[in-house]
Curated annotation (Swiss-Prot):
Entry binding sites for Zn(2+) 2: K146, H186, H242
Organism from which the protein derives: Salmonella paratyphi B (strain ATCC BAA-1250 / SPB7)
Residues that bind Zn(2+) 1: H59, H61, K146, D315
Keyword Zinc: yes
Entries under SUPFAM superfamilies matching the protein: Composite domain of metallo-dependent hydrolases, Metallo-dependent hydrolases
Name this protein carries in UniProt: Allantoinase
Length: 453
C-alpha cells in the first residue's frame, strides 16, 4: 500500500511506551504504526529524534478581536506551531468583546479566518451578566466554560470579561452540568487578594516578593476548596486552572479520591521559575497566581511526577510592552509562553529529572484532549489526526527575542539555555513548521466544535 507520508526511525511516544517505529499517514490521519509499512509519496527520516503527539495547549489568550495589538491569531498560532503546539484551546477573555454569547463567538470565528496555523477549540465565558445565554455557546460548540472567582476585567469597558460571585458560579455551574459541560475556574480569593494588593501599594511594597506575598497560597487553596464544593453541589464537572501550589493540588486530589469529577492543570513557569528569578526578570514574569518560592516549586514537581496534575498548559497571556512598564504591583499580569512550553518542559522534566516519554506525552497532549473531548487529537494511534512534533534531544540553544513569533517579541524565557529543540511540527499530515524552512504552507488550521467532530 502507498501512503501520503511515512515517518521513519523516530522514537515515537505512544500511550504506554516509547520506541523506534514508523508512522504512516493517509488523508491527514495516522493510518498505521509499525515496521516495513510500504511506500509513500513523502518520507521523513526522524533518526535520533523524539516524535511526540502535538501539544494540546488547553489555556491560551490570543486577544483577537478587539485587542489584536496584544496578540493575534496570525502571530500567536505561528508561535504555537514553532513551539510544537498543534491544537490550542482559546480562552473567552482578553479579546473585546469577551466571548459570552452567540454573537461574540461568531466574531472570534470571523477574526480567525485564514490566520490559523494550528487547530483551535474555543471556550465560552461564564460571567456575571450572561447566565441566561450560556446555552448559546453550548449550541455553537464550545468545549468548556471559563470563569474567575478572582477579580478580573476592566470595569470601565462594558463588554470586558467579569468575575462571578458564589451565587453566579453556583447557578452557572448548575446550567453547565445540565449541558454536560465543564466549568474551568481561576481560583484565588478575590477580596483577600485585592485588599492585600492595595495594602502593599499604600505601604510602598512593590517588589516581586511583595507581589507574591499579596497572593499567598491560602488564597488559592481556599478558592479551590470553595469551587470544588459548589461545583459538586451544582452537579458540574470542574477543571481547576493554572494551579501554582502543591497545597492546591492536594485539594483536587482529595476531591478526586472522594469521587468528584475534577481535573487540574499547571504551567511551565511554576516549575522552572521561582520568586528570586521573578525578581530578577521583572514584570515579564508577573502572572496570577504568582510564581512562588523554591520550596513550593519542589512540591509542584513532586505532584507532577505523582500524576496528580492532569496537564500542562501555557496560559499564554501577552500584552503590549507599555503595560509591563512601572513596578511589579502596577504592571499587567500575564506571561508570554506558548512557544516554549514543549522544549522547556522536555528539557526540565524528561532530560533533567527523568520523566518517562509516555508521561510527557500525556501531560502535553493526551490528557488535555481527553478532558475537553477532542476526539481526534492528543495521541499517536491509528485513526487519530496526524498531529506530530519532532523534538531534538540534547540540543542546547539560548532563546533570543528574535526567535519569538509573538506580536511583541518578549518572554521571561529570553536568555534561557534550553536543552532541546522543536525541529518540525505536523498538523493533519502537513509540515506547518520546520526549523530550517520556517512555515512552508499557508495557514490550514480550523476550529474544532464540540458537536461536529
Amino acid at each position: 500500500m502507498s501512503f501520503d507520508l511515512i515517518i521513519k526511525n523516530g522514537t515515537v511516544i505512544l500511550e504506554n511506551e516509547a520506541r523506534v517505529i514508523d508512522i504512516a499517514v493517509q488523508g491527514g490521519k495516522i493510518a498505521a504504526i509499525g515496521e516495513n509499512l510500504g511506500e509513500a509519496k513523502n518520507v521523513l527520516d526522524a533518526t535520533g529524534l523524539i516524535v511526540s503527539p502535538g501539544m494540546v495547549d488547553a489555556h491560551t489568550h490570543i486577544s483577537e478581536p478587539g485587542r489584536t495589538h496584544w496578540e493575534g491569531y496570525e502571530t500567536g498560532t505561528r508561535a504555537a506551531a514553532k513551539g510544537g503546539i498543534t491544537t490550542m484551546i482559546e480562552m473567552p477573555l482578553n479579546q473585546l468583546p469577551a466571548t459570552v454569547d452567540r454573537e461574540t463567538i461568531e466574531l472570534k470565528f470571523d477574526a480567525a479566518k485564514g490566520k490559523l496555523t494550528i487547530d483551535a477549540a474555543q471556550l465560552g465565558g461564564l460571567v456575571s451578566y450572561n447566565l441566561d445565554r450560556l446555552h448559546e455557546l453550548d449550541e455553537v460548540g464550545v468545549v468548556g466554560f471559563k470563569c474567575f472567582v478572582a477579580t478580573c476585567g476592566d470595569r470601565g469597558i462594558d463588554n470586558d470579561f467579569r468575575d462571578v460571585n458564589d451565587w453566579q458560579f453556583y447557578k452557572g455551574a448548575q446550567k453547565l452540568g445540565e449541558m454536560d459541560q465543564t466549568v474551568l475556574v481561576h481560583c484565588e480569593n478575590a477580596l483577600i487578594c485585592d485588599e492585600l494588593g492595595e495594602e502593599a501599594k499604600r505601604e510602598g511594597r512593590v517588589t516581586a516578593h511583595d507581589y507574591v506575598a499579596s497572593r499567598p497560597v491560602f488564597t488559592e487553596v481556599e478558592a479551590i476548596r470553595r469551587v470544588l464544593y459548589l461545583a459538586k453541589a451544582a452537579g458540574c464537572r470542574l477543571h481547576v486552572c493554572h494551579i501554582s501550589s502543591p497545597e492546591g493540588v492536594e485539594e483536587v486530589t482529595r476531591a478526586r479520591q472522594e469521587g468528584q469529577d475534577v481535573t487540574c492543570e499547571s504551567c511551565p513557569h511554576y516549575f522552572v521559575l521561582d520568586t528570586d528569578q521573578f525578581e530578577e526578570i521583572g514584570t515579564l514574569a508577573k502572572c496570577s497566581p504568582p510564581i512562588r518560592d523554591q520550596e513550593n516549586q519542589k512540591g509542584m514537581w513532586e505532584k507532577l511526577f505523582n500524576g496528580e496534575i492532569d496537564c500542562l498548559v501555557s496560559d499564554h497571556s501577552p500584552c503590549p510592552p507599555e503595560m509591563k512598564a512601572g513596578n511589579i504591583m502596577q504592571a499587567w499580569g500575564g506571561i508570554a509562553g506558548l512557544q516554549n512550553c514543549m522544549d522547556v518542559m522536555f528539557d526540565e522534566a524528561v532530560q533533567k529529572r527523568g520523566m518517562s516519554l509516555p508521561m510527557f506525552g500525556k501531560l502535553m497532549a493526551t490528557n488535555a484532549a481527553d478532558i475537553f473531548g477532542l476526539k481526534h487529537k492528543g495521541r499517536i494511534a491509528p485513526g487519530k489526526e496526524a498531529d506530530l512534533v519532532f523534538i531534538q534531544p540534547d540540543s542546547s540553544y539560548v532563546l533570543k527575542n528574535e526567535d519569538l513569533e509573538y506580536r511583541h517579541k518578549v518572554s521571561p524565557y529570553v536568555g534561557r539555555t534550553i536543552g532541546a529543540r522543536i525541529t518540525k511540527t505536523i498538523l493533519r499530515g502537513d509540515v506547518i513548521y520546520d526549523i530550517e524552512h520556517g512555515f512552508p504552507v499557508p495557514p490550514k488550521g480550523q476550529f474544532i466544535l464540540k458537536h461536529q467532530q
